[in-house]
Amino acid sequence: MDKKNIDWANLGFGYVDTDKRFVANFKDGKWDDGVLTEDSNVVINECAGVLQYAQTIFEGMKAYTTEDGRIVTFRPDLNASRFADSARRLEMPVFPEDKFVEAIKETVKANAAYVPPYGSGATLYVRPYMFASSSVIGVKPAEEYQFRVLTTPVGPYFKGGAKPITIKVSDFDRADPHGTGHIKAGLNYAMSLHAIVTAHAEGFDENMYLDAATRTKVEETGGANFIFVTKDNKVVTPKSNSILPSITRRSIMYVAKEYLGLEVEEREVFIDEVKDFAECGLCGTAAVISPVGKIVNHGEEICFPSGMDEMGPITKKLYETLTGIQMGRIEAPEGWLVEIK
């Protein structure tokens, strides 16, 4: 298939309208079969539950062109499972996980001309989402919902390579101990906007959120999980019931152990011990791994030995191995890559 006439090398990380998107509706207690449509507009009632009470969830994933020319997605079954968990928490109907994966495949296939070529550094970002579409005036779950999948080609998250970033320990809380921090709900991200705008105004790239109960333990940023590397090369990631279970983080921990032979540990990480780590990174779909060079905790600077010039050596190996798997340069574990045919 011929690709669209897009300057892939200079593609930004933003929205580009593509040819098709998938739409399914939940009404009278059941989902319809769903269809592909060319219409990118969503028309809903002014009193829709999504507008009144933020009843909406989403996922983020990518489709890639591999070294041998295949179009693949990365572990969509895990996105389907997490999406179902998010729906249950917000009292929304679960979109069947098998149909979720099929909708992803169908939408990517319909927009194959927008999947950037191998070696361009660009990918096709895939955004499944669901929202309450029927009117609600009292505080209660809606009765009707819409599930959609949109795609948009995006350039690399970091132009010219991933340079270490500087983050601050935030005075804001991202999630309550028994709240919604473990799901991918739109309301979580809306709550983080003021904090990230404030951080940017102060010259920082991101926020480090601590646990709301004690403010002593590391949780995550507004949209990425933390990974740390000890001075003896152990890969550590924070454990908390209010952290979003990142698919990228889960994959990185597997790669660290099974591909690189490193010791891994998921545990509570206290802010007081962060200064003792050798490397730090943020992991998520957008950038895979973003290296962190410095954390500022209310005037105290924590500078990692890996520095501000480039990724630390272990972080770099993790990044290169995982992206190698995603792009087909390194053999993937069974089921990780789903080919779009």
Task: Outline where the language-model segments fall.
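Extended, Lys/Arg-enriched charged tracts that mediate electrostatic binding to polyanionic substrates
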Residues: 117-127, 131
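Helix-start/capping segments and mature chain N-termini
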Residues: 1-107, 129, 136-341
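Charged, gly/pro-rich active-site loop segments
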Residues: 98, 107-121
